[in-house]
UniProtKB/Swiss-Prot annotation:
This is Bifunctional protein FolD. Belongs to the tetrahydrofolate dehydrogenase/cyclohydrolase family. Its EC number is 1.5.1.5, 3.5.4.9. Pathway: One-carbon metabolism; tetrahydrofolate interconversion. NADP(+) binds at G164, S165, S166, S189, I230. InterPro entries: Aminoacid_DH-like_N_sf, NAD(P)-bd_dom_sf, THF_DH/CycHdrlase, THF_DH/CycHdrlase_cat_dom, THF_DH/CycHdrlase_CS, THF_DH/CycHdrlase_NAD-bd_dom. PANTHER family: C-1-TETRAHYDROFOLATE SYNTHASE, CYTOPLASMIC, C-1-TETRAHYDROFOLATE SYNTHASE, CYTOPLASMIC-RELATED. Pfam families: THF_DHG_CYH (PF00763), THF_DHG_CYH_C (PF02882). The gene is folD. One of its GO terms (cellular component) is cytosol. Disulfide bonds: none annotated.
């Protein structure tokens, strides 16, 4: 079994990003900039945002974290996004999810300039992604695709099962796999006989937030398993949606948790921010 080491690959990508930033600063005399909006005091979100800011700093990307109270109104949040859209020094804008219940997440995501939408959640970018056109791709599925590429995993003609149909991972993951000419089945909580689907799969991508859902007897010998899930047990241990110990002697490729897909998400966010910085001139020249 080959371990898909997302931590090592993410460090490689971050080093590439740092070089790209240096080139942009030298050639265009601009510093790529990213704004992160954090609403409320959720500890997990705060930790994740801090990690994003640190990664930006290490890569030479200017970043600002805009903290807003849990009680903020939707109008106040939209006004903040509007200001960021107009700020030429900010190439990327992302809103840390989830948002409080008084906020309509769809309206907020649609308010972000599509050319600054480094999370790839704006309908403009989602549509372009589905149509296999150039777009900002959601960072986690983007990271998984980069992992396939790095390890020489062929997707064309392969049977791939995606377990989970979220807007953040499942749906975009399926779209990217379809564009890569894979035969894709998407399973959700209503799927009957999940095991029958996974046993027929060459590759399984799981992202549901249920510890150890995918077990050894659910995949065929030599299957590839990409575990996007991250769950904290009562013991404090972090585990994935797949039973790593049970699967490690049956799979040909397997991602660990932690250290698999997780580190790739921030690395690909940095890649998207660099992409956005290269669109700065295009944004400024719009009517």
């Amino acid at each position: 079994m080959i371990l898909l080491d997302g931590k090592a690959l993410s460090e490689k990508i971050k080093a590439e990003v740092k070089l790209e930033v240096e080139e942009i600063v030298k050639e265009k005399e601009i510093t790529p900039g990213l704004a992160v909006i954090l609403v409320g005091n959720d500890p997990a979100s705060a930790t994740y945002v801090a990690s994003k800011a640190k990664s930006c700093e290490n890569a030479g990307i200017y970043s600002v974290v805009h903290k807003m109270p849990e009680t903020i109104t939707q109008e106040e949040l939209l006004q903040t996004i509007a200001m960021m859209n107009k700020n030429p020094k900010l190439d990327g804008i992302l809103v840390q999810l989830p948002l409080p219940k008084q906020i309509d997440t769809t309206v907020v995501l649609e308010a972000i300039d599509p050319l600054k939408d480094v999370d790839g959640f704006h309908p403009y970018n989602v549509g372009r992604m589905v149509s296999n056109l150039d777009a900002f791709l959601p960072a986690t599925p983007f990271g998984v695709m980069r992992m396939f590429e790095e390890y020489g995993i062929e997707l064309s003609g392969k049977n791939v099962v995606v377990i989970g149909s979220s807007d953040i991972v499942g749906k975009p993951m399926a779209s990217l796999l379809i564009n890569a000419k894979a035969t894709v089945t998407v399973c959700n909580s209503r799927t009957k006989d999940l095991k029958a689907h996974t046993l027929a799969a060459d590759i399984v991508v799981i992202a549901v937030g249920v510890p150890f859902l995918l077990k050894e007897d659910m995949v065929k010998d030599g299957a590839i398993v990409i575990d996007v899930g991250i769950n904290r047990l009562d013991t404090g241990k972090l585990v994935g949606d797949a039973d790593f110990e049970g699967l490690k002697n049956k799979c040909s490729f397997l991602t660990p948790v932690p250290g698999g897909v997780g580190p790739m998400t921030i690395a690909m966010l940095l890649k998207n921010t660099i992409k956005a910085s290269k669109l700065r001139e295009k944004r400024e020249n719009r009517c």
